Amino acid sequence: MTTHERNEQLKIIHKHRNAIFSKGVKVLMVLIFTLSLFQSNPKEIVNAATPINFTGPELVGNPTNSSITINIVPDANIEYHYQYGTVSGTYPNQTANFTATANQPDEISIAGLVANTRYYYRMRYHAPGDGMDDWVVRDEHSFMTQRAPGETFVFTVTSDSHNASASNTGFVNAMNNINADHPDFHIDIGDTQFAEFTRNSSIQTNLNTAYKEYRATTHFGAFGHSTPVFLSTGNHEEEEGWNLDDSYSRGVANIQARKAFFPTPVEDGVFYTGNTDPLAAIDEATYGDELREDYYAWEWGDALFVVIDPFQYTMNLPYAPGTAGEENDDSQDGNQWSWTLVAEQFQWLKQTLENSDAKYKFMFSHNMLGGINRTVVGVGAGYVRGGAEAARYYEWGGKDAYEEDVFNDFRDPEDFGTKPIHQLMVENGVSAYFHGHDHQYVYELRDGIVYQEVPSPAMTGSGFSGIYTVGTYEDYETVAMCSNAGHLRITVSPEQATVVYVNSGSVTCTPSSFTRSYTIAPNTPVEGILGDVNGDGNSNSSDALIVLSGDAGMDISSFCPINCGDVNSDSLVNSTDALAILSFDAGLTVPFPLGSAGCPASITQPAGCNP
């Protein structure tokens, strides 16, 4: 087979990051562009087979069941290709040759791969025009394609590294610890590249520099060659909606830097779902599209992963101007209801949770929406602090500061429905929500859902005080709190998910007996008899009447949740299920196992469960 034929079979896609590009391209061709994204100032002249430095070494991203994306930033002009295969040291496949420009990001996607498979790859490069038999060979790395259900795998999580430097020992240790964990992928939930540090500048290249620093081997480059990195923005990346209309917006610059240096998922109609709403402020002529790359979801093994964005659609400033390093050009409205996903993202989240039957469902964002109702360390409540306690309020939980259920007073039911985020999480079997922002480790439970505050890998101490206290409360529990620094390692197996706090510095916990580890059970069929919603052991007309009443909005809360009423497993309990129960009670044959043990693990409860 010729190289051309192999490339066509493997559907290799090349997208230059130093030129116009479009993410999510699904065409069977090589796309090569030559327009420059950044000024080219080669640091050295490369002769044949002369090694060079890479400001951005190989970074893998956007893994799917059949493809991987690799991004590099070389310090000199090069011609290069990748060799790869499924056995270490053996590379039966080779991409076409591509050219990359000095100091500019360059990215290719390799498709046609096999799911649930580890691939080994290496780059070979030389100066453009050098002999085709003379190459510099870089180290071998590897990556996984999508795990199959039932396969055990590891992923890792960090938050709030706050533009850590290479001299930060705890941070560097954390990066090396992540590499030692060999995760299938890593999720970082923000306050990382820290747009605030470029406050006195109005130049895109300063944000680019911050992102390139995180490509170093002291940072995400320690593991990014073999571990895809998923980014979720934090408040200090300044992508809040009220910042995106500035004459020079660091939020927009942050989006553009992320698009250039870190492959991030977009809606592709096949593997990833996500935001399709364009942002006109993004320089389409340079970056190829106006996609925000802010929220997205995918499945891997037995788990669903959902990254949400509380920032870009929050248009009014709820706290004192300048608190997070923004400009002082926006006035404070002081309203915690201002924090929102907006209807489109809210409905996307709802549908994503409802449409998945994964054993585990994990959600991620830097902070919640609304937060607790008190000032923390001199900063007003609008700055959004807290986890399980905060899940009671505003768009997340539906209550206001006066403990009144007023969700639909502030959210149009035609756009948002009648249930706030936490209720959607409960009804759809969310296993855990990982959040940052408060600079400490906190393990909490609310309605069986883990609320996990992620520690910083770069800080020391116990974070902000006045937010969390270990104890059991009326509707949630704060199980344990620990100081920084480190990361989370989550091992997902069919039997359980194990969450471990891997420390990279000295850590103390409350209670002191806490082992920095806990497990999460998978979503399993609910115990009970299918069709029996009143708990009497039978599936009959009494149950059908309860289902019909709940579907009509009548109060049936004393029987809720009524997962056993979803007899046709469509995630709803309605008149269709009632008819099936009545037919079964009358002795008619129905295509559902009514009267058998086991009920759906997660459903949308009928209106009568929340009258």
Regions found by a protein language model. Give the residues of each.
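Sec-dependent N-terminal signal peptides
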Residues: 18-37
